[in-house]
From Swiss-Prot:
Required for the formation of a threonylcarbamoyl group on adenosine at position 37 (t(6)A37) in tRNAs that read codons beginning with adenine. Catalyzes the conversion of L-threonine, HCO(3)(-)/CO(2) and ATP to give threonylcarbamoyl-AMP (TC-AMP) as the acyladenylate intermediate, with the release of diphosphate. GO terms for molecular function: ATP binding; double-stranded RNA binding; L-threonylcarbamoyladenylate synthase; tRNA binding. InterPro entries: DHBP_synth_RibB-like_a/b_dom (IPR017945), Sua5-like_dom (IPR006070), TC-AMP_synthase (IPR023535), TC-AMP_synthase_SUA5 (IPR050156). Belongs to the SUA5 family. TsaC subfamily. One of its GO terms (cellular component) is cytoplasm. GO terms for biological process: regulation of translational fidelity; tRNA threonylcarbamoyladenosine modification. The gene is tsaC. This is Threonylcarbamoyl-AMP synthase. It comes from the Bacteria. Its main location: cytoplasm. It catalyses: L-threonine + hydrogencarbonate + ATP = L-threonylcarbamoyladenylate + diphosphate + H2O. It comes from Psychrobacter arcticus (strain DSM 17307 / VKM B-2377 / 273-4). It is found in: Cytoplasm. It is an enzyme of class 2 (transferase). Keywords: ATP-binding, Cytoplasm, Nucleotide-binding, Nucleotidyltransferase, Transferase, tRNA processing.
Length: 214
């Protein structure tokens, strides 16, 4: 499809269809816009790494809709560690200005029926996971569940070229990537929506040590 007619939808089902076909997708998250793809599609991940100018060794964050999707990953934690992670994903009782998205590095379990690809874990023996709070993206993750992706994972990284601030709206996301790839055949789809307005930046922690990475 021509980049003069960008892929834009308000349908989660359509957006999931694009992801399953290897499309990159920009979408609203808790605080900023994110951009992602099917984490089990190596070509799509490599395309995303290229436009983000991100080294593969760093790994990628994935989001899902429910802790129940990743029970096997949470089993690698002790009771206290697991409860800390689960509590961080419960935001209903938190004041809006204090809400924060929490991503955790979870150890890779040997019990996984579907292995997490090396192009997602990077140089690490863990995977960075967040149960996302955004209702639209929760629905998107649920649509991504399949035999090859039982976790409902979608890659999630900030929607911006390297060196630029993350997009805060659909129009900003479009300006970044329609301009950035005007001379290439790479095309980004867009899922209409608004961020949840979280004011605090997202946080990344190591679930085993409790160390805050970012």
């Amino acid at each position: 499809m021509s980049l003069s007619t960008p892929l834009i939808t308000d349908s989660v089902i359509q957006a999931a269809h694009w992801l399953k076909k290897g499309q990159l997708l920009a979408y609203p998250t808790e605080s900023v816009w994110g951009i992602g793809c099917d984490p089990f599609n190596q070509q799509a991940v490599m395309q995303l790494l290229t436009i983000k100018q991100r080294p593969i060794e760093k790994g990628m964050i994935v989001v899902t809709d429910s802790p129940s999707r990743i029970t096997v990953l949470l089993e690698g934690l002790d009771a206290v560690e697991r409860q800390t992670v689960l509590d961080s994903w419960q935001t209903d009782s938190i004041n809006g200005t204090a809400k924060q998205a929490h991503t955790w590095l979870l150890p890779i379990s040997q019990k996984l029926l579907i292995t997490i690809p090396s192009w997602i874990t990077g140089a690490h023996d863990s995977v960075a996971v967040r149960v996302i709070d955004h209702p639209l993206v929760k629905q998107l993750c649920a649509q991504m569940v399949s035999a090859s992706n039982p976790y409902g994972f979608v890659v999630s990284t900030s929607c911006n070229p390297a060196g630029q601030p993350p997009a805060l709206s659909l129009s900003e996301a479009q300006r970044y990537f329609l301009r950035h790839h005007a001379n290439s055949n790479e095309c980004v789809g867009y899922l209409k929506g608004e961020t949840l307005g979280y004011q605090l930046p997202s946080q990344i922690g190591d679930a085993l040590t409790g160390q805050i990475i970012r």
